[in-house]
Curated annotation (Swiss-Prot):
The gene is CHS. Keywords: Acyltransferase, Flavonoid biosynthesis, Transferase. The lineage of its organism: Eukaryota, Viridiplantae, Streptophyta, Embryophyta, Tracheophyta. PANTHER family: CHALCONE SYNTHASE, HYDROXYMETHYLGLUTARYL-COA SYNTHASE. This is Chalcone synthase. The keyword Nucleotidyltransferase does not apply. The keyword Cell division does not apply. It comes from the Eukaryota.
Length: 405
């Protein structure tokens, strides 16, 4: 065999190992803790449980934050019983990492299991067909990791290929899809379980008059887990709901220190610059233009490129209402474009990496309920956007699936 023949043979083998079509979302499952906190009464609970009722002016500020948050309720593992038993969690700056870790290493994979079981049930295939696991959390760090723990909890095969992502932050719902997309498309027959599980036990802390950015986080964050089954070339018995056609990641210019999280003896501290909404809205147009150019124009599919940003569906991480408001204004979006995102923010708060997967699930369900033509609010193309530390933006170009109305 000549060198050219050997090279051609190797190329053929590599091609045979790859899938034919794009990565596809085959099922979605979500889960939340049992404890529900109404946003309207949360300031009273928060300042009472942290013994901070004497901070009357700060409580008024916090109440206004909660009123303007666009949130109706949130779910959290932490409750009065846990917090009273662990008062170090209620101080702003007290050594508490061991307590937080002890909670997170148990509850993060447990909540991930609940979401995964729902996704596997919807998928309808035996869990033995799961070939890969991608797990993401910003809540705690451990070895072996939450991926190992979830593998044990679900009874997955010990040979499942695992990837654990810790400390990524709010953009990571896009990151896990980007990574899982590459895995699914480059491994023929792969079925990837993607899990994001977030618990606020690592960030909960009492109020501080000198760190209002931390107070913003206390007004926004909630607990939740989402799981997705991803694979290319769906079988007849599988029911795809979205295709992943392109993905990218960007560090926005002049954004150093805009969103930071630091793991300390006191837990995970959260720092937020006031101009985060402005930085994101200023750059989002270029991010989308670059994505569309790469996905459509440079790949020979210019005729498929949507005419405008109002001709696509939007799944945007709800970092807070100000981000959504300024992106809407900058991109001149119709009010309904962020409806799915705002619905999830209202019902669950900011669940960090899990949010965009909750929104994806909500969108396909509402599209079917409203008898629209596709899983993407009746439209063919859409974007999923994750915003987080860096300041990083993750972008995934989605194609919806036709619904049998």
């Amino acid at each position: 065999m000549t060198v050219l023949e050997e090279s051609a043979d190797a190329s053929s083998r590599r091609l045979a190992q790859r899938a034919n079509g794009p990565a596809t979302v085959l099922a979605i499952g979500t889960a939340n803790p049992a404890n529900v906190f109404e946003q309207s009464s949360y300031p009273d609970f928060y300042f009472d449980i942290t013994n901070s009722q004497h901070m009357t002016e700060l409580k008024l500020k916090f109440s206004r934050m909660c009123q303007k948050s666009g949130i109706k309720k949130r779910y959290m593992h932490l409750n009065s019983e846990i917090l009273k038993a662990n008062p170090s969690l209620c101080a702003y700056w007290e050594k508490s990492l061991d307590v937080r870790q002890d909670i997170a290493v148990v509850e993060v994979p447990k909540l991930g299991k609940e979401a995964s079981l729902k996704a596997i049930k919807e998928w309808g295939q035996p869990k033995s067909k799961i070939t890969h696991l991608v797990f993401c959390t910003t809540s705690g760090v451990d070895m072996p990791g939450a991926d190992w723990a979830l593998t044990k909890l679900l009874g997955l095969r010990p040979s499942v290929k695992r990837l654990m992502m810790y400390q990524q932050g709010c953009f990571a719902g896009g990151t896990v899809l980007r990574v899982a997309k590459d895995v699914a498309e480059n491994n023929k027959g792969a079925r990837v379980l993607v899990v994001c599980s977030e618990i606020t036990c690592v960030t909960f802390r009492g109020p501080s008059e000198t760190h209002l950015d931390s107070l913003v986080g206390q007004a926004l964050f909630g607990d939740g887990a989402a799981a997705v089954i991803l694979g290319s070339d769906p079988l007849p018995e599988e029911n795809p709901c979205f295709e992943l056609h392109w993905s990218g990641s960007n560090i926005l210019p002049d954004s150093d220190g805009a969103i930071d999280g630091h793991l300390r003896e006191v837990g995970l501290t959260f720092h937020l610059m006031k101009d985060v909404p402005g930085i994101i809205s200023k750059n989002i147009g270029k991010v989308l233009n670059d994505a569309f150019r790469s996905a459509f124009d440079e790949s020979g599919n210019a005729e498929d490129r949507p005419a405008s940003v109002n001709d696509i569906f939007w799944i945007a991480h709800p970092g807070g209402p100000a981000i959504l408001d300024q992106v809407e204004e900058k991109m001149k979006l119709a009010p309904e474009k962020m409806r799915a995102t705002r619905d999830v923010l209202s019902e669950y708060g900011n669940m960090s990496s899990a949010c965009v997967l909750f929104i994806m699930d909500h969108m396909r369900r509402m599209s079917a309920q409203n008898k629209l033509q596709t899983t993407g609010e009746g439209l063919d193309w859409g974007v999923l956007l994750g915003f987080g530390p860096g300041l990083t933006v993750e972008t995934v170009l989605l194609k919806s699936i036709r619904l049998a109305c």
